[in-house]
A protein has these predicted regions:
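A cross-family phosphate/adenosyl-ligand binding-site feature
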Residues: 2-411
């Protein structure tokens, strides 16, 4: 899977040696992670997975089963993790160390069965038993042929794992196999598992992308928005342990990994209706981020297709409902962050308009942007304006995301 957004997050951090990695975030900084590699063919993905863990600053300990060594060498995994690999019993007994989380990838049915039945015939199995005893988060990544996965015994084993408090991450069937998810997806899931224990984690709804409205049966008008900023914020907050609901319009950029709760609403009406549905959830969001480019003006579409011709076609656009205003009665007490995009105005005018939006809708903050500056690396990524009149420059996406997280977590 491509990673179109990574350079903008940490642009000034580079590799300094052959085993080095580009740092993309700090979601696993100072976290001790055990990666247990069992003997599935997906063990070949261990190099990529180890390096992805390190991109988020995890301290990675690797254990490999004897079967895994038949598929990939400890030397390759040691290079990827920049650490020694435990392949057999030794006096250091790393399997009894304390870890912030354990990943079993790939998790063969044999390994899952042994863990459930308490068999400790290898360092990996002892480490898993100790982790369960310490209530350490464990993430299993089953990978096997579809026929084996569909065996009722396998399904029972997975159900037992979940009932014991472990988490299981599955990829959709591909080539009649349940393959291992991408390293990006696995590490994002792990970040969420580890960081959800941090204080003040919240359910956060974020609108993103553009609205489109028809003017006849084949033509439409649409705001300019790729959805990039919304996806970046969503991924960051998910990694930080928040429960994220994405309300998505029309986008040209896609997330780097599947987020767990994505709901769609491309037109202004359908996006607002989806927002109403989210606000009415049994457990409603405690925070809202209004990052979508909502279509403020649109029309009732003409019937059929207007015939092509040389004459002018005059249309009348009428103002639509303001989503932030319409949602207000349903989200009282929630943290709310708006976005303000302007063009051709001074910095002070932009800030004044952002502060006006805060005052008008009772927002906790507004991220203010100049259209001419959004994609220009010579300008900051935005400015955050607060109700007290303070303004803070946001130089990078990483700083923008961290500021949004701070507002949500500390309000």
């Amino acid at each position: 899977m491509r990673r179109p957004l990574e350079v903008k997050l940490c642009p000034n951090i580079y590799m300094v040696k052959d085993t080095g990695v580009k740092i993309l975030g700090s979601s696993l900084k100072n976290r001790n992670i055990l990666l247990a590699i069992s003997g599935g063919i997906a063990a070949t993905e261990s190099v990529k997975l180890s390096r992805e863990l390190r991109r988020y600053q995890a301290d990675v300990t690797i254990m490999m089963s004897k079967e895994a060594e038949k598929i990939i060498t400890p030397l390759a995994v040691s290079w990827a993790s920049d650490n020694e690999v435990v392949t057999d019993w030794n006096s250091k007994m790393h399997q009894l160390d304390s870890y912030d989380a354990v990943i079993v990838a790939p998790a063969t049915r044999n390994t899952i069965s042994k863990h459930i039945h308490g068999i400790m015939d290898s360092p990996i199995m002892m480490a898993l038993s100790a982790a369960r005893g310490k209530d350490t988060p464990i993430l299993f990544i089953p990978s096997m042929h579809k026929d084996l996965f569909d065996d009722p015994v396998t399904q029972d084993l997975i159900s037992i794992l979940i009932s014991q408090g472990s988490e299981v991450l599955l990829e959709e069937e591909n080539e009649n196999k349940i393959k291992q998810p991408s390293p990006l997806h696995i590490v994002a899931k792990l970040c969420n598992m580890v960081n959800k224990k941090l204080p003040n984690r919240k359910k956060v709804a974020i609108t993103l992308g553009a609205n489109r409205a028809p003017i006849d049966a084949v033509r439409a008008i649409q705001n300019a928005s790729s959805g990039q900023t919304g996806w970046i914020i969503s991924e960051y907050l998910y990694r930080q342990g928040h429960d994220i609901v994405c309300i998505v319009g029309k986008t040209t950029v896609h997330p780097n990994f599947p987020l767990p709760d994505v709901r769609f609403g491309g037109s202004p009406e359908s996006m607002l209706s989806t927002c109403f549905g989210v606000a009415s959830d049994k457990i409603p969001p405690e925070a809202w981020i209004h990052a979508a480019a909502v279509l403020d003006y649109y029309m009732h579409p003409e019937d059929g297709k207007k015939s092509s011709g040389s004459e002018n076609w005059e249309i009348t656009l009428s103002p639509g409902p303001k989503h932030i205003l319409e949602l207000s009665p349903l989200v009282k007490g929630s943290i709310r962050i708006g976005f303000k995009l302007e063009t051709g105005v001074s910095d002070q005018d932009l800030i004044d308009k952002a502060f006006e939006q805060i005052s008008k809708y009772g927002l906790d903050a507004v991220i203010a942007n100049m259209k001419e500056q959004v994609h220009d690396p010579n300008f900051p990524r935005g400015r955050v304006v607060r109700p007290d009149g303070s303004v803070k420059l946001l130089e990078t996406y990483e700083i923008l995301c961290a500021e949004v997280d701070s507002i949500i977590s500390n309000s």
